Amino acid sequence: CNDTILKNMNRRSNRAELLDVIGKLRREIPNITLRTTLIAGFPGETEEQFEDLCNFVKEVQFDRLGCFAYSAEENTVAARMDGQIDQEVKDKRAELVMQIQTGIMAQKQAAKVGQTVRVLCDGVDDESGLYLCRTAADAPEVDGNVCVSSEEPLYPGEFYDVLVDDSDLYDLYGTCLLYTSPSPRDSTSSR
């Protein structure tokens, strides 16, 4: 991010303050998942300022990130600013940020292989037979799944420990290790 652009956006912090807060969060909560949404192509954004944004993304290594091309909203200060950027340039900049994030995500996903994660079961995928689960870091309908194979049935709304065997850009794949809570349908069952 760039201090001039942050100021023009009427943000109350600067790059150094943001990096400081992010550093404190990571020191205090080592397994924290950091997510953000960015805007590329804000009015007046120069190539150098855009490079600052790209470098910020590379430095911070967000766990989840979305980047959108700036779009003028009617009756806003930004819509009346000089230096409106061509839509094609804005789209290309947003795409470049997402390409950087794709590389970061691939590394972060691959690093989870071999780890045990706690997941919440959302249900089963009828096509693959795998259980669709998510970690505490995953937003439903936004983030990927932890696709779980299990010798025992898993129940929606219940938590399980899963060994991550594989990953792709968005999803993790694993095997259920521990059945941590009984099914609400059968409180006497033993798994």
Positions of predicted regions on the chain:
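Conserved non-cysteine loop/helix-boundary elements of the Radical SAM core domain that shape
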Residues: 1-64, 70-89
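Secondary-structure boundary/capping residues
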Residues: 34, 106, 110, 189-190
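Terminal RNA-binding accessory module
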Residues: 69, 80-181
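Single conserved hydrophobic/aromatic residue that forms the stacking wall/gate
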Residues: 179-191
